[in-house]
């Protein structure tokens, strides 16, 4: 089974992805991490984020062992990843990596921005997570402060709104809900309630297929 979770920045999709994967015993991939890894590689090289040739080279040289690097969670790397992820050749270079991960039995949970529309359009369950921008900015600010990083909530909100617009308007795999995705509004749900809602969606889909 493939479970696709999409949504904008700081909507809570990553936490839902991890918890769903643990619940069902599936592997989990936060696809945003792979774009952050590419972006960090370019930043470390001092390269332009729009240098598609160097970005593709970084994508092809990805080392999954680096995905746990705490530096990938920084606001700077996140903003850089949004720029890099808009490059069509970079998205193409990472397509097979993500699809091969999804095909691993007995199942996988992938979260990102184009899982249900581009990466795994045949996913068994598609969930599109949304949350108010102000709520997302507050969450992201608390996360940064918890890591010991300075964070101004007003600036974080401005960055999130800018990133939302960039993600929705990019030519390559824009952020949007798949036609058959289940909407999950995470604005006012705590983690446990959000996870329960996501599990309910998965179970409803599974029950419907068993009745067919």
From Swiss-Prot:
It is an enzyme of class 2 (transferase). GO terms for cellular component: cytoplasm. Disulfide bonds: none annotated. GO terms for molecular function: ATP binding; CMP kinase activity; dCMP kinase activity. It catalyses: CMP + ATP = CDP + ADP; dCMP + ATP = dCDP + ADP. It is found in: Cytoplasm. SUPFAM superfamilies: P-loop containing nucleoside triphosphate hydrolases. Gene3D superfamilies: P-loop containing nucleotide triphosphate hydrolases. ATP binds at residues 7-15. The keyword Kinase applies. InterPro entries: Cytidylate_kin (IPR003136), Cytidylate_kinase_dom (IPR011994), P-loop_NTPase (IPR027417). Keywords: ATP-binding, Cytoplasm, Kinase, Nucleotide-binding, Transferase. Pfam families: Cytidylate_kin. GO terms for biological process: pyrimidine nucleotide metabolic process. Its EC number is 2.7.4.25. Belongs to the cytidylate kinase family. Type 1 subfamily. This is Cytidylate kinase. The lineage of its organism: Bacteria, Pseudomonadati, Pseudomonadota, Alphaproteobacteria, Hyphomicrobiales. The gene is cmk.
């Amino acid at each position: 089974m493939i479970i696709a979770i999409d949504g904008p920045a700081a909507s809570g999709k990553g936490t839902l992805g991890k918890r769903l994967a643990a619940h069902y015993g599936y592997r989990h991939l936060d696809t945003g991490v792979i774009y952050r890894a590419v972006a960090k590689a370019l930043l470390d090289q001092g390269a332009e984020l729009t240098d598609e040739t160097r970005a593709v080279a970084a994508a092809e040289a990805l080392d999954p062992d680096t995905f746990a690097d705490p530096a990938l969670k920084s606001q700077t790397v996140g903003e850089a990843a949004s720029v890099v992820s808009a490059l069509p050749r970079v998205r193409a270079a990472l397509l097979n990596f993500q699809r091969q991960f999804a095909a691993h039995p007995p199942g996988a949970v992938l979260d990102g921005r184009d899982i249900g529309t581009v990466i795994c359009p045949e996913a068994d369950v598609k969930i599109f997570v949304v949350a108010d921008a102000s709520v997302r900015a507050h969450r992201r600010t608390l996360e940064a402060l918890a890591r010991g990083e300075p964070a101004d909530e007003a600036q974080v909100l401005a960055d999130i709104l800018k990133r939302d617009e960039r993600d929705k308007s990019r030519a390559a795999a824009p952020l949007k809900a798949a036609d058959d995705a289940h909407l999950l509004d995470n604005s006012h749900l705590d983690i446990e309630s959000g996870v329960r809602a996501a599990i309910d969606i998965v179970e409803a889909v599974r029950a419907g297929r068993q009745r067919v």
